[in-house]
């Protein structure tokens, strides 16, 4: 069993983009930014508990940080992890929070 404290640290934010909007409309898939060390099992448990929905599958990928120039120095942005969470048929997550 995963601790409640860990579940709250796994999901960082929803990832909003054109592709994530298309996935949400067509495939019932929601995209989240997650902790870099989060596993698929932790992501599935966190989404199921926090949003009270049934999760079918989780796909993850790590985006490598880009190299950026700041003046004469070269810096690097941090790596981050993205998770595509497919919800069960009929399940839905509303981020707008309409009343």
UniProtKB/Swiss-Prot annotation:
PROSITE patterns assigned: RIBOSOMAL_L23
GO molecular function terms attached to this record: rRNA binding; structural constituent of ribosome
GO cellular component: ribonucleoprotein complex; ribosome
One BP term from GO: translation
Record keywords: Ribonucleoprotein, Ribosomal protein, RNA-binding, rRNA-binding
NCBIfam families named in the record: PRK05738.1-1, PRK05738.1-3, PRK05738.2-4
Function: One of the early assembly proteins it binds 23S rRNA. One of the proteins that surrounds the polypeptide exit tunnel on the outside of the ribosome. Forms the main docking site for trigger factor binding to the ribosome.
The protein, known as: Large ribosomal subunit protein uL23
